[in-house]
């Protein structure tokens, strides 16, 4: 029962890497970010405002976390999200963290979301600070402590294909050793 958790900073490539890992391993992908965005849209609240709302309403995070934990317990899943690894570490075979400089992530986000670089950079910095405070107060998790991760990958100067290849090489090697069979 394989469980892989992929976490990382906004714009680091975590969603794209997680999607490809899930495809290659033929596992479902569960994304806490998309669940969070869905909840924001359903409530008709701007994404950043929803982060602020969630900071005051921990039930939002708890709902998403409970869903992630249940999927991890069931096994055979790739979980993706900012806190995925911290939340499901007891059930995960492998935890990967992707990071990149704030400027590079802002550039990626500005292209992805069709917004100015300046707006994306402001949003990245604001979102990170909101997340840092919320996770520290709600979970007592310091998102700068990466000790729960098996692999920390700086994607600043990697193409997305390089980030995927490195992640899959690591995953396939570890799972092959752990389960004594070929995974990829």
From Swiss-Prot:
Presence of the UniProt keyword GTP-binding in the record: no
Keyword terms: ATP-binding, Cytoplasm, Kinase, Nucleotide-binding, Transferase
Reactions performed catalytically: CMP + ATP = CDP + ADP; dCMP + ATP = dCDP + ADP
Enzyme Commission number: 2.7.4.25
Example of a GO MF term: ATP binding
Binding-site residues for ATP, renumbered to this chain: 8-16
Pfam families associated with the record: AAA_17
Keyword Iron (UniProt): no
Domain of life: Archaea
Any one Gene Ontology cellular component term annotated for this protein: cytoplasm
Location of the protein in the cell: Cytoplasm
Biological process (GO), any one: pyrimidine nucleotide metabolic process
Stated family: Belongs to the cytidylate kinase family. Type 2 subfamily.
Protein name in the entry: Cytidylate kinase
Origin species: Pyrobaculum islandicum (strain DSM 4184 / JCM 9189 / GEO3)
Gene, per the UniProt record: cmk
């Amino acid at each position: 029962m394989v469980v892989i958790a992929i976490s990382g900073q906004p714009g680091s490539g975590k969603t794209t890497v997680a999607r490809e890992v899930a495809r290659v391993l033929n596992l479902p992908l569960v994304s806490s970010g998309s669940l969070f965005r869905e909840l924001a849209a359903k409530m008709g609240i701007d994404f950043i405002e929803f982060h602020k709302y969630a900071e005051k309403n921990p039930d939002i995070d708890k709902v998403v976390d409970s869903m992630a934990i249940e999927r991890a317990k069931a096994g055979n899943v790739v979980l993706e999200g900012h806190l995925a690894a911290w939340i499901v570490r007891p059930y995960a075979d492998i935890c990967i963290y992707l990071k990149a400089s704030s400027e590079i992530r802002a550039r990626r986000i500005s292209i992805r979301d069709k917004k100015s670089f300046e707006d994306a950079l402001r949003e990245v910095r604001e979102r990170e600070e909101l997340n840092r405070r919320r996770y520290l107060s709600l979970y007592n998790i310091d998102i700068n402590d990466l000790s729960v991760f098996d692999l920390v990958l700086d994607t600043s100067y990697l193409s997305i294909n390089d980030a995927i290849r490195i992640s899959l090489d690591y995953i396939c090697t570890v799972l092959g050793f752990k389960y004594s069979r070929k995974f990829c």
